[in-house]
Every structure is written in structure tokens, then in C-alpha cells.
Amino acid sequence: MRHRKSGRQLNRNSSHRKAMFSNMASSLVRHEVIKTTLPKAKELRRVVEPLITLAKTDSVANRRLAFARTRDNEVVAKLFNELGPRFAARQGGYTRILKAGFRAGDKAPMAYIELVDRPAAEEAAAE
């Protein structure tokens, strides 16, 4: 029985899931918007939001925790130097999921997951 077990399995074993979400979190931090399936996007929120909350207070310990989850120094630097200060006043809700139809090959529901208040989106809206 799987009572009270949270999180989606996504037909992967635990190490594959952990690696996949680490890679996806790094991609989301690096590009600020990625396209993926809807269930993966919903689950990715549970990985990325705590990382950004961690980045709001800059310390060596927090940087090491972020590195342990992402294994990428470039991503850790962007988290603490750009995203932490950008979301300092926001109490959670750092990501937005936009549904993007269905994939042609297998009709999987697709979605964009993006960071809210990203500069590229603000520039496009101003034009």
C-alpha cells in the first residue's frame, strides 16, 4: 500500500528521478524557462522552489547545500547572485506552469515551467 507517500514515481527508479530533477532544476535556473511534460513540471516545482528559498540567505552552508542538490557551480552562482536577491521580497511561488498542448508523438501533456518576474518576459511585455 502506498498510503501517504508523496511525489510522483514517473516510471523511474529513485536514482534516475533524483538525477533527472537535478538536471532539470539546473536547466530551469540557467535558462529560466524550459518545456517538459506537465507531471514533470509539477514535480520540478517541489525541487526548484526550496532551492530559491535557500538562495535568499547567502552563506557558505547554503551554497554547499545548493551544490549538493545541483552539482553545478555555475547554477549555484546564479542562484545566490541573481535569483536570491530577485526573489528576496517574494514569499514562495517563484515558478509558473503554462500548459502547452500535447506532444505530437505520444499525446503527452506538455507545459512550460518558468521563473516569475524574469527580465526577458518583462522586456517582451514592454514592447
From Swiss-Prot:
Pfam families registered for this protein in UniProt: Ribosomal_L17
Highest taxon, organism lineage: Bacteria
UniProt-listed InterPro entries: Ribosomal_bL17, Ribosomal_bL17_CS, Ribosomal_bL17_sf
Keyword list, A-Z: Ribonucleoprotein, Ribosomal protein
Transmembrane spans: none
Assigned GO CC terms: cytosolic large ribosomal subunit
GO BP terms: translation
SUPFAM superfamilies: Prokaryotic ribosomal protein L17
GO molecular function list: structural constituent of ribosome
Assembly and binders: Part of the 50S ribosomal subunit. Contacts protein L32.
Family to which this protein belongs: Belongs to the bacterial ribosomal protein bL17 family.
Name of the protein: Large ribosomal subunit protein bL17
Native source species: Vibrio vulnificus (strain YJ016)
